[in-house]
Amino acid sequence: MSDYKKTLSMPNTNFEMKANLSVKETKIQENWVLEKIEKKILAKNKSNTPFIIADGPPYANGDLHTGHALNKILKDIILRFKASVGFYTKYIPGWDTHGLPIEQEMAKRGLNKNANQTITEKRKNCKNFAIENVYKQRDQFRRLGILSEMDEIYVTCDLDYVIRQIKIFNKMLSKGLIYQDLKPVYWSWSSQTALADAEIIYQDVESDSIYVSLEILDKNEFVSKGDKVIIWTTTPWTLPSNLAIAANPKVTYCRVQVENSVYVISKNLVEKLAETLEWTNYEILSEFSGKKLENLPYKSPISDKKCKIIVDGYVSDSDGTGLVHNAPGFGHEDYLACKKYNIKPYCPIDNLGKFTGEVNDKELAGLFYKDANPIIIERLAKKKLLLKASKFTHSAAHDWRTKKPVIYRATKQWFVNIDKISKEIVAALNKVKSIDNTIIKKIKEMVLNRQEWCISRQRIWGVPICIIYDKDYNPILDPKLLNNIVDILNDEGINAWYNEDAKYFLTDSYNTSKKYIKETDIMDVWFDSGTSYSVLQADKLGYPADLYFEGKDQFRGWFNSSLITSVAAFKKSPYKELLTHGFVLDENGNKMSKSLGNIIDPLQVCKEYGADVLRLWVASVDFSKDVSISKDIIAQNAELYRRIRNTLFRFILGNLNGFNLKKLRGAKYSEADLYVLSCLSNDIKTIKACYDKYDFKQIVKIVSKNVADLSSWYFDYIKDPLYCEKEDNEQRIAIQATLYQLLDSYLRILAPIIPHTCEEAYEFFDKKDKQKSVHLEGFTNFKIDSKYKVDFKKWEEFFDLKDKVYSEIEKTRNEKVINSKGQAHITIHSKSLPFDEQTLERYLGVAKVEFKVKEKDGTTIKVKNSKYARCERCWNYYPTNLIANELCERCKKVIGNKKI
């Protein structure tokens, strides 16, 4: 038997089967930088419409996690696609570099503990650490295959950025949208600073629950002297600061006789309280509105001071007693209610959560607030004021960084007045679009639920609030002075604020012999990142940005702060479109944690599988929800990647070897070729629409299905003409032209998702007008010529028939009747066939197709061994009389007089 292998046109390409991405990707990335691919793309699209994604800055602390990878890769896919269709897509990544975590890291390292250190020296240590982490994370992001070279970045501690931020602060100040006030704010004793809503998390805690009776000291026509109001509280430690009791003016209250005492409570809660306080025998004496209690005096439970009952609509009669203990120094609603009665906040708790001497109680002074609870409860019991004490579990506010409980505490802070611009915020949001309508609704609710935003922090590592006070601690809001401060800081650096005396910043109009004091607080880090749109303004990239795209936690964070500052300063939303993604969880829906051992390190995935496999996972998930990742899930995506690489790219590259590009135009396509090209044309239209609406998972589904479909039929069918026909055979040339269009299109389709592999395959692709990079090609514009008409119904019938035939062939093979489908003789009983028998023989890859008309509906298929002889060159089966000297007629002609 002769060896005919040398006479076949077998696939040949240097595009390797083994990806070896961990090595190849870094080289490809180096080449992108060397060839300035990003800059060439930007130059190519410079005069076109911009599409700008504003980068929400990750925090410059630690290594990247899968959440970072998900976010950056999603943005990169969008930008690569937008660039491929002609948009100008300059991208400036940024980092959030201020804040408590870095101060805490310095404390861990012992760098900022020296009592002799200046604030400037401490800030320098913080900055060095932050910048070190910026560069580390930048290199890690580059490993993910981000198109941006990241040579132009923004960092929130850079002087230019800080100056722009202070100018925005001053602009809001000049509009009366920033003010200072003494009022309760979330206070973290563990971090020793005020916190904003976005910095609060909720965790279950066990608290004291007490019911306390307080004696009324006077009478009116509805209440008698000596009657007792009942209050319920879960914060006994605030009772020394009690300054009022609040009733609802519209709620009905009653006097209830219980043994020798008369209590005043909400009528609606009598039965509930009777059960809670175990009143076995009680009588309602009278009823009246809460308004009738206003200004009645009572004795405060711990201080014994004479206080008064006030009325306010916030008081509820759905739980408690319908009467609320008010400590305006420790509660926001208390503060607002008491303010109407000119009752000022009283707050005898220090930064560490300990009672100060102001409490005027030797036993409590210096005590941590929680430790005061048992002492206060014991005192109430001794005074016979305690009606009931118990424990209960509830959700309470905690510091998001330290995970310790926080309290409301009245301190002098700086606030943004959100309520004042609420209408402008709504108007701005109404112009913002989103693929998910609930996103706009959610951000609107999040912002409008806040009347104010506390933006001052009692720390050192941040942007200083550059305000100077007079000797009486009144802030001087003179625009000329504020501008002078900005000019000095711009010239000398931000640390001049800490190095110089307050008088150094004064203009000539001020009397320097007087006393002036500098503000020591810094701005909330959300104000830092929330003014990052200034980067776009400074770079003239277009403001508002086309897209803000971050995790769903940013409704309370970056989306929120950016919107507030932008509307306040510039009367517009900073984004035209808003998009969110979910959190990354393990395959069981659990959060990543070291204790569970379920952490997937994105950099380790890049090392083990390659960034393109990680990127394929990102593209395959429904990012609008929480997404799952695990070793098994990554392995599944690696298998899909392998099919794309080898079944699609490598197979086609191998079979385009020697293809004459000049033959593209005159190719004479078969019905099969035209069907494949028509499907490609339709899919390109669908895929482009998916890219436009960020539906990457659907793109992956389409590509995955097409790879499976092509490999299961078309690629199998075309092997015979590709391998066995002469190189100039018309059918073979048409098939190669079809493969050319498939490869050219899929390289461009998949370039945003698996950019390294598409770049590698493109290197081996001999194509017309070849560029330096596949990413300079632009998105595929292939569209099948309208002169070609494809009967898709006929093809549906064919594929339905194919599945039935192959199913019967498999049964016959299992029964050992045939060894391969090439031996099969197929008899089809049906009303009609989609193609004639000879065409079906080629398309199905069988020896013989015999058609027998069947009057009734349905198709019956029978398979038997054709008993034909095999051609030893092409391995097709023919009647014995058509095989001579091992070869079929076609193969004899192809070989001709060649010596084997």
From Swiss-Prot:
Gene3D superfamilies: 1.10.730.20, HUPs, Valyl/Leucyl/Isoleucyl-tRNA synthetase, editing domain. Keywords: Aminoacyl-tRNA synthetase, ATP-binding, Cytoplasm, Ligase, Metal-binding, Nucleotide-binding, Protein biosynthesis, Zinc. Binds 1 zinc ion per subunit. A motif ('KMSKS' region) lies at residues 591-595. GO terms for molecular function: aminoacyl-tRNA deacylase activity; ATP binding; isoleucine-tRNA ligase activity; tRNA binding; zinc ion binding. L-isoleucyl-5'-AMP binds at residue 550. A motif ('HIGH' region) lies at residues 58-68. Zn(2+) binds at residues 871, 874, 888, 891. ATP binds at residue 594. Belongs to the class-I aminoacyl-tRNA synthetase family. IleS type 1 subfamily. IleRS has two distinct active sites: one for aminoacylation and one for editing. The misactivated valine is translocated from the active site to the editing site, which sterically excludes the correctly activated isoleucine. The single editing site contains two valyl binding pockets, one specific for each substrate (Val-AMP or Val-tRNA(Ile)). Monomer. NCBIfam families: ileS. HAMAP family: Ile_tRNA_synth_type1 (MF_02002). This is Isoleucine--tRNA ligase. It comes from Malacoplasma penetrans (strain HF-2) (Mycoplasma penetrans).
